[in-house]
Amino acid sequence: MLVPQDYRIPFGIGYLLGTFFLSPDLDLHFSKPSQRWKFLKFLWFPFWVFSRHRGITHVPFLGTLVKLFYLIFIFFFLYFAVLGVLSILGFAPKELLSFDPFAFINEFLKSEKGFFFILGLIVADLLHIVLDIVSSFIKRF
């Protein structure tokens, strides 16, 4: 196998998430990957507004990175929104205040496990794109 044994789990998780939740077809609000987000589907509404089907999400590597950066942006936005609301209400727990989301994301992206997780996402997207091309070619005949 091409993935070292120590990194098969992060790669596998990335591949499964990339296949079932972060597919290039996530740019369609009615697609299966979009439906799998259930009640969190609303998080993708801005993404649907600014992307067209088979647009940037179907560009190898770039589509994966765009979705990943979008999720990171949503993570930061929600973290600071929740932190702000809890602070206003006087309920901000010390664990939440001491958590550094920038350091967390930075360490994850620099780690080998993070690399293989992202590689799993990329492989899932590449396979999806190849299957789209093959199925489109077959439909022509």
Swiss-Prot record:
It is a multi-pass membrane protein. One of its GO terms (cellular component) is plasma membrane. Its main location: membrane. The chain crosses the membrane at residues 7-24, 39-56, 69-91, 116-138. It comes from the Bacteria. It holds the Pfam family DUF2227. It is found in: Cell membrane. Keywords: Cell membrane, Membrane, Transmembrane, Transmembrane helix. This is Uncharacterized protein aq_2157. It comes from Aquifex aeolicus (strain VF5).
